[in-house]
Amino acid sequence: MTRLRDRYRALLLDLDGTLYRGHEVIEGAPEALTADGQAGQRLVYVTNNASRGPQVVADHLSELGFPASPDDVVTSAQAAARLLAERLDPGAPVLVVGTDDLAAEVDGVGLRPIRRFDGAAPAAVVQGHSPHTSWPDLAEAAYALRADALWVAANTDRTLPNERGLAPGNGAMVAALRAASDREPIVAGKPYAPLLEDALVRAGSRAALVVGDRLDTDIEGANRVGLDSLLVLTGVSTLDELRKATDGQLPTYVADSLDALNHAAVAVEPDADLGESLQRNPGRAVTVRASDSEIR
């Protein structure tokens, strides 16, 4: 039997809603990733959440039972910092709306993170999720954007899943700045290409499967960069939303849980009902569309 995961050299794994919700691990997820026969497959943890650095993310994953080191983690904060470094002179001031970990990524690429400014506007504004973002933070960023500073958003996720439900995500704060500045940001995270491009470099192969819970970020992002994807129904997107999805948000596979990686996928007729197909094949992924990027 060829397991679904055996078709790929790397798994690009979303975190929130795919591996855990807040501080609660999704049942069976660690065991699914550490099943026998995993050897040789690269696991890359790819998160749109820019609030924590790779070490903190890896420590959290390890505490929950996932095999992870900082080198296995790719964040939207890292991708945002790379975009800034490609566009700005070394040492340029960048107004940070987000956590100290986001500021550290900006500093790490040779730019100067700041929180406030007097006089000349900063060269850029970078915006990532922080539970402590306040009105003064957004106002400072709006002043800079009105003065033509470059604007890079780590991601535009409208919601952030946790153990209580869906909380406002960075996209909700981006929407506030969009309204205040009449500007549009450059976006580093999924569904845009920069974050997944960084993840592919880390994986060392394009024979990679994107695994996530959101049609509008994980799955659309995979389609934009020409990768196969598995939608797991453990987080934000539902089966009803999948039935209504546009072509750009159709996954290659859909499954109820991550354990489907350890079983063969099931091909179904194009007009088959996906819910009924999943019920008839418990624990297995159902093929939604043709594969693009598996090992040939």
Model-flagged regions — what are they?
Residues 1-13, 20-39, 50-71, 81-296:
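Asp-based, Mg2+/Mn2+-dependent phosphohydrolase catalytic module
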Residues 43-44:
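N-terminal helix-turn-helix
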Residues 76-78:
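Polytopic endomembrane small-metabolite transporters, centered on the Drug/Metabolite Transporter
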